[in-house]
């Protein structure tokens, strides 16, 4: 993720603007006067010279991941820009990022205290919270444990190895029927519109023990809100980088608060219902598991980490929000690439037909036998890089990296897009080529090459749902490729241009899908 300055800050009077500008100029001059001294033996961070007040905003453009990649060619893998009045260190290069987030993980494990982050999940977000002490670690461990244990529970029937597989298979089957119905009625479909609801239903089943119809207005509204959230967070809030703007009216901030309030209200309502019907001997879903843990902690006088009801809402909100946005975006991009590369789509279908057959649905256990599908997914993550940045990190103490001094509380951006398109790592990185991940005979994926792809962060802030997300993308894709053939609309050009945001989506479009002949009944 990248946070950029936006020119819109609301309607303010001329006098208010003059006062704000004067104050910002004074603060800027004071900051320049007290510029950080560099310890002996370390170097000052390189980077472009910032303008007063606005910093290097004008040099970022509408595609900051590309602008910062270009800057890294000039300044190296560790350099500094200034966004508004906040210094930001930008890290790129696989080895540099690995050094920072893994080998020096404690130094870079923080989150910056950005104004807008305080309002995400009412400040209780695992992903965005500045907290990284004992309580945060306990909450993260709890969320990870609940997510993993419920996804691995046995399915309700022997044909499914686990609850996660059961949810995905049932939603995948429903998605195929839904797309077939839409095609017969309209002749085309919006890939994002239908995929995102199916994926949302998987995480709803895991978190809340319920599913929604594809036309359910509450769920469709929340999916729309999630899309808005990604765009707003991705485009940035000026008050995050020019603190005085926190006190001026802003239509963008008002919209941001509305989005977060709606999400919190939705989850709070469901958590409250779970408290009312909670039965310790019948844990139905992740929310029940978290409530059970909360109740145990309240009874345990020796527990040094208590879990409040508000923080349960925050954890569930995090899991719900992140649980469908990343997966649905990956799947939607996958369908676009299938249409853009019909020869790859046919090769994937042939692999599934040969290794799984057409008489049963693909399962998680088939994954090792479908190396080209796994390579295709890796190349989707690499080539699209729809997660161009991680959520910003922050240094927890004065530190150094590659010989450069980085003060405590410095905001740090990780440029995942640069790593995934680095010509030092990838041959012809601009080409879409799943074979780059396969062994010479095509029988298996090269694990070392696969690990070079950066999509979920790394280190102490790595996405806790990565394994589940990868399994979801794999199984949904295997199911729909087995049954459907995706095509462009005749005469229409496929637009693969990404739209910048927290997760980069492709432009909304319509495609065609036909049932594979041998699957028609």
Curated annotation (Swiss-Prot):
It comes from Platichthys flesus (European flounder). One of its GO terms (cellular component) is endoplasmic reticulum membrane. InterPro entries: Cyt_P450 (IPR001128), Cyt_P450_CS (IPR017972), Cyt_P450_E_grp-I (IPR002401), Cyt_P450_E_grp-I_CYP1 (IPR008066), Cyt_P450_sf (IPR036396). Substrate binds at residue 229. The lineage of its organism: Eukaryota, Metazoa, Chordata, Craniata, Vertebrata. Heme binds at residue 463. Its cofactor is heme. It holds the Pfam family p450. It catalyses: an organic molecule + reduced [NADPH--hemoprotein reductase] + O2 = an alcohol + oxidized [NADPH--hemoprotein reductase] + H2O + H(+). This is Cytochrome P450 1A1. Its main location: endoplasmic reticulum. The keyword Heme applies. PROSITE patterns: CYTOCHROME_P450. Keywords: Endoplasmic reticulum, Heme, Iron, Membrane, Metal-binding, Microsome, Monooxygenase, Oxidoreductase. Cytochromes P450 are a group of heme-thiolate monooxygenases. They oxidize a variety of structurally unrelated compounds, including steroids, fatty acids, and xenobiotics.
